[in-house]
Amino acid sequence: MQNDAFKSKVLIESLPYFRQFSGETVVIKYGGNAMIDESLKQAFALNIVLLKYVGVNPVVVHGGGPQIGRMLQQLNIPTNFREGLRVTDDATMDVVEMVLVGKVNKQIVNLLNLSGAKAVGLSGKDGQLIRARQMEMVISKEAQAPEIIDLGKVGEVTGVETKLLHSLQRDGFIPVIAPVGVDENGETYNINADLVAGAVAGALGAKRLLLLTDVPGILDKDGRLISSLDTARTMQLFEDGTLKGGMLPKVKCCLEALEDGVEKAMIIDGRIENCVLLELFTDHGIGTEITRACS
């Protein structure tokens, strides 16, 4: 009886959020341990299905770095990283596309469909969904000339074809996007999944952008979770060195999404079961939320 009462309390607490998000788009970047652990995979799929059932329009953008790494190792193709990004030559690009588009994407689509959704797998090449160009990286070091790093076919997003996504949403489908883009000449690019998720969220005018990670959220210099930030305070964390490593591109894409009109961006711990529902539909949420600074 107590358990039933608790469940009822949770549903009542969630009701205002169901109303708030009904008809809205939420973009979720799916990656990390949530893509590997079987119980977390099942929970994620059910979270996405429930979003759809209560009137939310979820869009999933996924990563797949570990899967790419394993396939490159099996094929004896050497891997090189610069500034946290995989240097992508032609052979590596072929493997990236094969793994992300041909395997990981289809596994996620199948999981969602078996859980009761209508999911459709896409890459950025489908309908020129994700337009891209080669990423230019220049590293400046004190007392040294700037270093230009050639990352090969690593790209950055230049545009998103929203008509395709809107059409799928109107017909009740959940888009699942592999972070592979294409330029005007048909060249294929490997793009950081966080950056694709942020660009898609901004282009769609999403209400929320959620990035699933393997950490609790943004941490201060003492390792404590920062639950809420605005853009001004976030820029201070860039400047004082609090943000570093893999958190840098995540926060960067959050700020760009907010600038493009997304209401809130969240960095949450994908290792927590039902993390998507806990973030969106409870009073306290989890992880770190970033909002635009008050003018």
UniProtKB/Swiss-Prot annotation:
Site positions (Transition state stabilizer): 29, 250
Protein name: Acetylglutamate kinase
Domain of life: Bacteria
Entry's EC annotation: 2.7.2.8
Keyword Transferase: yes
Keyword Protein biosynthesis: no
NCBIfam families in UniProt: argB
CDD domains for this protein: AAK_NAGK-C
